[in-house]
Amino acid sequence: EIGFTRTLHGVMQNITHLCSRSKSRTWGKDGWKKIVVCIIADGRKKVHPRTLNALAALGVYQEGIAKNVVNQKQVNAHVYEYTTQVSLDPDLKFKGAEKGIMPCQVLFCLKEHNKKKLNSHRWFFNAFGRALQPNICILLDVGTKPAPTALYHLWKAFDQNSNVAGAAGEIKAGKGKGMLGLLNPLVAS
């Protein structure tokens, strides 16, 4: 759940940044209403229970609701929707409006079976993409922590040039507290 909360809290910090752009024609204080965070878990038995606990703490998930068969038909996925008012940081501390966190619209898709990453992308684009009709999609893997303004800069690349069809961000290894991560040769390289 640490990697998950690191990523989601980073996204929520980015939403806060977008909402702080008071002179923007697109963003501003209600900018959060233009963003939907879609989380896709690849298999009900595969997702870590503590990740589900984190989602439940945010109000997004309810334990015991999902069933694998309904009316004698196999269920493929379970979808939960909630607008959360709080975030969990990587230290599992709640952060809310008092820390500047804006509301966040969350769609959580818990796939019944593990069918790997490309299937999850298919779910995102074919199911949620068709329903939401987004202008821009940003895909993040769990554990990736976007810098506080990273999503703004990705969005800006699309906004400034309608011919841009894709953009990529730079990934930097986290050095850890006191740069102790540099003791790991993979991080240090």
Curated annotation (Swiss-Prot):
Main enzyme class: transferase
* The keyword Transmembrane is annotated on this UniProt entry: yes
Query: Which is a GO BP term held by this UniProt record?
Result: chitin biosynthetic process
Record keywords, A-Z: Cell membrane, Cell wall biogenesis/degradation, Glycosyltransferase, Membrane, Transferase, Transmembrane
Annotated membrane topology is: Multi-pass membrane protein
- Tell me its EC number(s), please: 2.4.1.16
Could you tell me one molecular function GO term of this UniProt entry? chitin synthase activity
Gene Ontology terms: cellular component: cell septum; plasma membrane
Domain of life of the native organism: Eukaryota
Homology family: Belongs to the chitin synthase family. Class II subfamily.
Put simply, this protein is called: Chitin synthase 2
Q: Which organism is it from?
A: Aspergillus niger
Gene of origin?
chs2
